[in-house]
Amino acid sequence: MRRLIATLLLAGYVSTVTAQVVDPQNVVIRNVYVAAADAEHVAINILIRDNKLELASKDAIPTPDGFVALDANGGYLIGNLKLGEAPSFIILDGDPREDFDVLLDTETHAVFAVHQGALRKNSLLYASGTLDEAEEEPKPRGWLAYTPPPMAMPTNYGDEAKWNQWKTKNTTGIFLAAVVLDRQHWPSQNSDSEQQVGDLEFFEGGEIRGFRLGAVGTLHYFKRPWVYTVFGATNAFDKGFEVDRQDDFTWFDYRLDMPFTDSMSLSVGKQKEPISMERVMSLVQLPMQERTSVSDAFLPSRNFGAVLSGTALNQRMSWAGGLFNNFIDSGHSIGNTATAAIGRVTWLPFVSEDESNLLHLGFGARFSNGKQGAHYFTEPEFNKSPNFVNTDPLDSNGNSQFNLEASWRRGPYWLAAEFIGADVDSPTSGDLSFSGYHVTGSWILTGEMRDYNFKSGILGPVPVSRSVYQGGWGTWELAARYSSIDLTDGLIDGGEMDILSLGVNWYLSPIFNVNLNYRFITNDKDGFSGDAQGVMSRVLLMLE
């Protein structure tokens, strides 16, 4: 429908329309809104080179030599943004969804029009040479739910012409899928490490790390649209191609997000617990291939429950709290399954005017009645490896975890740190305390910047300004991380492990990336001091 409207509107402009002198073949248009779904829109910047649409991005686009930069000043774009083709779209000075008169009187409200590369109208003002010098751009609305989808949403979400997207009178949706291919190699391992975990050469080789698929969309039966999320994963590949488990499939994320107000919503279903930025963020959006040993050991991946979340202080603060009981997957009754109460609060003590520089602080806590005991263990941040530290199952009258987090992001630079402490009230082993922390740094060499999600208090995926399919180099990111975990206390010798990790990520496009991780691992356990070095290569492909 949007394409049809744009075609009809553009057809109404003839070559005699007066236009400001602009070369439509080489132009940058900044500060323009496009529809992302019926309930939201995003602000983007557009680059047209040699009469073809080369780039549409939420990130800054510098003005190349010989180009003209125009400021759309928050205008609303209707048309078809198809990369590699001559542009055909119109920019209106208002949102036609809020005021239909904008469409009825395009002679007044159209500020820019181009049809198959031919300029039909332009009354936009020239913009400054860089986005930083331009007027303040409108801020895009964030994802409605507290926990974003497991995969990045495309910017063209809501385009029912795409085969994997749909739209009816009361629903919208998009089908997403991802496959992750890994190759593991262990260059070295000392004899103490072999005594602790065995010969790591048996864990070398390739594997399909995961195959995930699902759908996310909106339900428009209510004043504020509800968001549904359904995702599953096959486990057959990670289980060594066992014939009797080839069809194993786990629904790991199914929930409804119901907004009460513009700043508060309720999520019900199987979902991530609201604690730790690293845990809430999608795995495919982190700078390293796997989460830290600290997060994997102490915090569950997902649980069944309800989360109430919202923002305060003009979105400088986010909060979330929930109750969880995983009786559906445990096979036990609610009374015989552990019940947990979880909460998280984040705060931005500093945000620059253009939001390119910010400081994030967060605190989270988790309390469980310990009905199913406690058990903390983890691999050395490689999926294809044995557990290096392990407390073994512990009886428990209750257990708790608390989390401290801090992040500083300035443009392409990101520095993050988290601490997690875990306490167990064990009738046989006494009061036990375990802990761990990590410090992670990321530098996007090509200059892109991760968006900050004010609703959830997390950072988003790495944007790709110019993919290899557009003649660019894609996006390159360097990452480094140090993590430490201590699972030894009292009579429990779960071990202590420190890991230094280095990584390089190459995002060829928003849906295709390859990366390489190196880790140096030291492990003190069972009276031995083991060390090992591991390397993992990964290919990630997502369905567009």
Regions found by a protein language model. Name each.
Residues L144-A152, P187, D199-L200, N357, ...:
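Outer-membrane beta-barrel pore domains
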